[in-house]
Design a protein with these regions (language model features):
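Terminal amphipathic alpha-helical/low-complexity segments used for targeting or macromolecular assembly
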Residues: 1-178
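Structural signal for interior beta-strand "rungs" in well-ordered beta-sheet cores
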Residues: 183-299
Length: 299
């Protein structure tokens, strides 16, 4: 049958898909001069940040103690340019006025944020070093820090989270969420950039972990695979829609351990030095030092 016989079907589909009511809420109107967030550019940003934080493990593998300053300098310059463009894309994308081009003020703001982010890279390296140390110390199968940095999906997910969290704190819209969802796709770990997580954090056998937007996690906390730190319920507004931004996820204090497939829901507190066993649901506060495990089935 000739393709021409299908022309009316294709035309009808185009007409229906072009009706404004059909794409209401699904359409982003592009304006000339407004950059859009780029998945490729954001991947490059993450790889550059990794190459700066973990020199020699990512990026140029020929870096040594004599050339490290040069390589970091080159990567920082590239990172600044790429990050400025993507931050600008986020600022323009998140603007309430979709019909106006990005302003010079927004361009200056994007460059300022990129510079401040880069100024925080030494602190990001310091805290990620504690995460690597926690993973190494907590896993007898790990033979070196290099193995942890190169191989462990948890370190990849935590690195993305810490980069994204810093950008979120600096006021960047959209981009932080894309960065953590990239790690979600790669590793199966869903860490919202809004969560606050202390140092020496590790996820053993890192996959399937969910950490919600308003979670607060102290220092030296260890999660195992499949742990969910989620919301128990969503308060609704007068229109029946979830109220955004309210605290609704758990607080884990220092030195907490949560074993595999445990589910902890709601704005509850797991006290310092507590242990939560695997495959259980927790919806109430857990005292400091407590040990919560499954109860034995009654005969």
């Amino acid at each position: 049958m000739s393709p021409l016989n299908f022309t009316h079907i294709l035309t009808q589909a185009v007409d229906e898909l072009s009706e404004s009511e059909s794409y209401k809420g699904l359409f982003h109107q592009h304006t000339d001069g407004n950059p859009l967030p780029s998945a490729k550019a954001l991947c490059d940003i993450i790889e550059l940040a990794r190459a700066i934080i973990f020199p020699g493990y990512f990026g140029n593998s020929t870096v040594n103690s004599r050339t490290v300053t040069y390589h970091i300098g080159v990567n920082v310059e590239r990172l600044f340019d790429l990050l400025t463009e993507q931050i600008l894309a986020g600022l323009c994308f998140g603007s309430d006025d979709e019909c106006s081009c990005c302003t010079e003020l927004q361009r200056e703001e994007a460059a300022s944020i990129a510079a401040r982010f880069i100024s925080h890279l030494p602190e990001l390296r310091r805290i990620l070093a504690t995460d690597v140390e926690a993973a190494y110390n907590g896993d007898p199968a790990a033979h070196s820090f290099g193995e942890v940095i190169s191989c462990y999906p948890a370190i990849r997910a935590i690195s993305n989270y810490r980069i994204a969290h810093e950008l979120l704190v600096l006021g960047v819209p959209l981009i932080p969420r894309i960065i953590t969802e990239m790690a979600h796709s790669e590793t199966g770990n869903d860490i919202h950039p809004g969560a606050a997580i202390g140092g020496y954090f590790t996820i053993d056998h890192g996959t399937g972990v969910v950490i919600g937007e308003t979670c607060i996690i102290g220092k030296n906390v260890k999660l195992y695979q499949g742990v969910t730190l989620g919301a128990k319920s969503f308060p609704l507004d007068q229109d029946g829609k979830p109220i955004k931004g309210i605290p609704r996820h758990p607080i884990l204090e220092d030195n907490v351990i949560v074993y595999s497939n445990a589910t902890i829901l709601g704005r509850i507190t797991i006290g310092k030095d507590a242990t939560v066993g695997g495959n259980i649901w927790v919806t109430e506060d857990v005292p400091a030092g407590a040990r919560i495990v499954q109860t034995k089935a009654k005969k």
